[in-house]
């Protein structure tokens, strides 16, 4: 008798995706982040569900409901901090996952890559709206500043902002709708993840060498299930270290002050994972220009596959491109640091230089380096 996992209509899908899936024999730990992102999403949905059982999305009670969760609900503090720091782990894994895609040329799987970009935008939107929910000072002013950016859109801008707010300022209507969107988006993300995997399984995984690996495949289970399990243990350990020892390390102290529309915090800044984009936004003195640069800083990922001039897929054997890639990583870390600094000399100049460098590396220097490498290799 054939094994049920190979015949049952539902189990067959799971079997072909997680058990009998042919996988390249040489994929490194950089291929662990996909499954880690899946784990992050599950942690976020579960902790979020339990938080939603006690949270109230009303401006008068939102802040105190979060306090109530931390003080009075059984292990409420644990659920809340797992959710808040789980978001940080989510973004660490996301950026590593995208970085892996750029380094090893995985972006040549166009459908998978484009769904991935949509997923990135969806996760960023979800995280932004989630940050508004505790209704602290940074929640309120972050929501005000970021939604206000849409007013830079010519002609319809102001109307659009007031439509999103549901009034003439960030208020009860805004908080309620943000909670509704924050609740529904993770399930949309989960559906998109299915599509992401569907497209990935059409082609199979890439590998560090960038060379087709059809002649050398191994079953996903047990080899990569055990490897993923190790990744899970390491990430959960890191998350628990953060949650149990310094849960507020990555947060903003201003968010422990209830939202007050009459009192603006001295430095309005988003969570650490948005600081690089925030620095790019601030580096341009013009409002519309800044907004366009902000959107382009992420949307530029969609252009990367069309700028691939190398005859090789991966950067594994391309030292010039490798150097540029790591300069890009250092540049993003610089932008992250600048995003958290006040708008004054020398930070303004550093931010502008780093922003120009970010776009230059991706749009000009990397394609040029690839052409030079082709020439050196006489291709």
Swiss-Prot record:
Example GO CC term: the record gives: respiratory chain complex III
Q: Which positions bind heme b b566? A: 97, 196
Citing just one GO molecular function, the answer is: ubiquinol-cytochrome-c reductase activity
Q: Which GO terms describe its biological process?
A: mitochondrial electron transport, ubiquinol to cytochrome c
Q: Which organism is it from?
A: Bunolagus monticularis
Cofactor-binding details, from the entry: Binds 2 heme b groups non-covalently.
Q: Which family does it belong to?
A: Belongs to the cytochrome b family.
What is the name of the protein in this document?
Cytochrome b
Note the CDD domains from the entry: cytochrome_b_C, Cytochrome_b_N
Report the gene name.
MT-CYB
Q: In which domain of life is the source organism classified?
A: Eukaryota
Could you tell me where this protein is found in the cell?
A: Mitochondrion inner membrane
Q: What does this protein do?
A: Component of the ubiquinol-cytochrome c reductase complex (complex III or cytochrome b-c1 complex) that is part of the mitochondrial respiratory chain. The b-c1 complex mediates electron transfer from ubiquinol to cytochrome c. Contributes to the generation of a proton gradient across the mitochondrial membrane that is then used for ATP synthesis.
Q: What else is known?
A: Heme 1 (or BL or b562) is low-potential and absorbs at about 562 nm, and heme 2 (or BH or b566) is high-potential and absorbs at about 566 nm.
User: What Pfam families would the database entry show?
Assistant: Cytochrom_B_C (PF00032), Cytochrome_B (PF00033)
Q: How does it assemble?
A: The cytochrome bc1 complex contains 11 subunits: 3 respiratory subunits (MT-CYB, CYC1 and UQCRFS1), 2 core proteins (UQCRC1 and UQCRC2) and 6 low-molecular weight proteins (UQCRH/QCR6, UQCRB/QCR7, UQCRQ/QCR8, UQCR10/QCR9, UQCR11/QCR10 and a cleavage product of UQCRFS1). This cytochrome bc1 complex then forms a dimer.
Q: Where does heme b b562 bind?
A: 83, 182
So which cofactors does this thing need? heme b
Organism ancestry: Eukaryota, Metazoa, Chordata, Craniata, Vertebrata
